[in-house]
Amino acid sequence: MNGRRLLPGKPIPPSEIPDYSIRRDTLEEVFAEPFRLRLKRIAELVKQSGEPLEGNIFYPDLKDGYAGEPPEGDLAPARRNVWRAVRFKERLLEVGVNAGHSALLALSSNARLEYYGVDIMSHAYTAECVDFLKGEFPGRVHLFTGDSREVLPWLVGRRAELAFDVFHVDGGHTDEVCRSDMGNCIQIARGQRGRHVLLDDVHASWIFDVYCEFVSRGDLTTETFFGDWEEAGRNVLARIE
């Protein structure tokens, strides 16, 4: 699966064009100027913290020269997959916020989307980056701080109130934490139609095995949008059963 090349639709009024989108005939990413400025500001906040940048959907792990650099081309399939996952959704719960790059992408792809993040706050830059996004997207950005293995079970009790319809699991990268996060997200979504989970880093065998475990148990069904999904993205989307 390499992404479908589709005939472009009718022109969209400028006021309705999202800050991040893709050209359906070429798969080229389209970054609006507000998006570029926000991406630049996040880079500045990370630099000011003095910490190296943890890998994300725009830049590889510990890349030093990211400030002012365009997004990494090799990661474009992963970014396009996030766009595919969130563009018709209403409320996203992401496990693992980091510097907020995935949050920025999701919020910029869908003007209706509300974002909720869970993060253990191990990086000095995370709080400032989230505060910046809150200012840029008023009323649409929320943060739960703490270990996902404690926060997510708490959210199970608020599942009806919050009604998340898409989850992004990109937190602790051990099989134990991944299995816990996936299981809890499934519990939050259980019994509700149209719920999906996006799992990152499936190029790691232990993460891929956790995903296969849930598929084999009948908890998940892989979603490809009729072959539009890009396997090169190293992330996978599933419908929660």
Regions found by a protein language model. Give the residues of each.
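A short alpha-helical cap/connector motif
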Residues: M1-H168, G172-E241
